[in-house]
Amino acid sequence: ASAKYSAVVGGGKNTASGLSAFVGAGCGNTASGNNAAVVVGGMSNTASGLSAFVGGGCGNTAAGKGSVVVGGSNNITCGGHSTVGGGACNTAQTEDSVVAGGRCNITCGDHSTVGGGLNNTAADSGCWATVAGGCGNTASTSGFVGGGMANCAKATNCWATVPGGCGNCACGGGSTVGGGKANCSLATVATVAGGCRNDASTDFSFVGGGCCNRILTCGDTIAGGKENRSAGGCAFIGGGLTLSANNVFDIIGGGCGNRTCSDTTYGGYSFIGGGKDNVTVCGA
């Protein structure tokens, strides 16, 4: 203990070099912060930030002002008042950010949180992002990813949500992908509830499930099915295969290969209940 009011209680090769610094025990620990840095124990831990704290573990560093590493190994807190609870190789880079545990997780935006898992990133841009767990997930400004694998909630104007699944992406403001695989909601308040390779690319659009369904105009709905396409505006497809709703307020309940007229002058408000290869005639 080399600084005023500093103390090393026990252990070996410990150093308390900051004003009012404290090392409780362990081996090779250093408390060097400007004021009141603390290392309770463990091995090769460093508290270098003002009033920084390391509880234990191995190779942990609390470098931010008032930052905390509770335990684990090779964890780092760089942001002021940031926290890493445990795990390994986690980094809380920014102000008031938290990594609770897991491995190789990182918070890049202020007030962001990673609960656990592996290789997750909260707020690669912006702040207030949350990744609860999973693997390889990313959340940006005010975005939320619950879990799963390789999901992203990356809206530039906030509030994108992906609770789970694999390879899903919510990129529009207030957009949601509930789960499934390789689904995308790309516009404001667009939603894909589940399924596989579905695309809600316009504002206020909705895909319930199924596979390879695509919405191209605002306010459209595809409840399910496969390879259906809605491009009408407030149009609806219930389910089925290779259905196409092409004009405003068109409805196709189901079936296979059914399509409505695409003429914007004479089409619209068409209805096909089901069947196969049915077509509504424009102006009829």
Feature locations, PLM:
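Periodic small-residue-enriched repeat registers in elongated scaffold domains
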Residues: 1-284
